[in-house]
Amino acid sequence: MSTLLHIDSSVRAVSNTNPDHNSISKSIALRFIETWKQHRPQDEYIYRDVGVNPPDFINQDWVGAVFTPDDKRTPEQKERLALSDKLIDEVSAADVIVISSPMYNYGMPAQLKAWFDQIVRINKTFDFDLSRGDFPLQPILSGKTLITVTSSGEFGFEKGGVREGSGHLAPHLRTLSKYLGVDTMYEIVSEYQEFGDDRHRVSVANAKDRAECLASELSLSTTDSLLKSDSVGSDLGITP
């Protein structure tokens, strides 16, 4: 049995009275999840909608608690870190992680960044050793597969695209993924939302098809090297 951790971050719901307000990223991720569950109903499923129920932002007291040795933390400091501990436990338990995110102002939503800030924590998800020279940080967790589902109003943020360098969502997710223990990463992308034309409709349809295909492939391969390889998948493909 595997554990699937699903994180949504759009402030919108999957289904609204006005369908124009439906979350695209959540709907694509849901296609992946539903397909996965069809193939692997026995797996543990953990879900958090950080867009609707955002984690607390870290603050000075949080940082102080993190850098206080475990045996010297006050009850208040332990309570301050309780949510962080819980979120880290969920990531640690996961074999497969699905993160859906819209692009807000060319980056990730603040709520998703808050989730990462609660998780990327010294001596929990990374350690620090200056003997490593200019790269003292090293992830602690490993062996996980990440599927990111992103949606954007514009297009062409990929390498060589017309907006290369202006989209910070996907690069940020790739950088932070190693602190979740990710060895293998797949990206599913939907674009053109602001244009509302055929390009957008085709992009969403293709993303949902990719999500379903990828979920089928991975859910049937949880015991082989497909989930445990050291490579990174393309943004639309299913092969790492």
Curated annotation (Swiss-Prot):
Its cofactor is FMN. It holds the Pfam family Flavodoxin_2. Quinone reductase that provides resistance to thiol-specific stress caused by electrophilic quinones. Also exhibits azoreductase activity. Catalyzes the reductive cleavage of the azo bond in aromatic azo compounds to the corresponding amines. Its EC number is 1.6.5.-, 1.7.1.17. Homodimer. It comes from Idiomarina loihiensis (strain ATCC BAA-735 / DSM 15497 / L2-TR). It is an enzyme of class 1 (oxidoreductase). Belongs to the azoreductase type 1 family. Keywords: Flavoprotein, FMN, NAD, Oxidoreductase. It catalyses: 2 a quinone + NADH + H(+) = 2 a 1,4-benzosemiquinone + NAD(+); N,N-dimethyl-1,4-phenylenediamine + anthranilate + 2 NAD(+) = 2-(4-dimethylaminophenyl)diazenylbenzoate + 2 NADH + 2 H(+). Binds 1 FMN per subunit. This is FMN-dependent NADH:quinone oxidoreductase 2. Signal peptide: none annotated. One of its GO terms (molecular function) is FMN binding. FMN binds at S10, S23, I24, S25. InterPro entries: Flavodoxin_fold, Flavoprotein-like_sf, FMN-dep_NADH:Q_OxRdtase_AzoR1, NADH:quinone_OxRdtase_FMN_depd. The lineage of its organism: Bacteria, Pseudomonadati, Pseudomonadota, Gammaproteobacteria, Alteromonadales. It comes from the Bacteria.
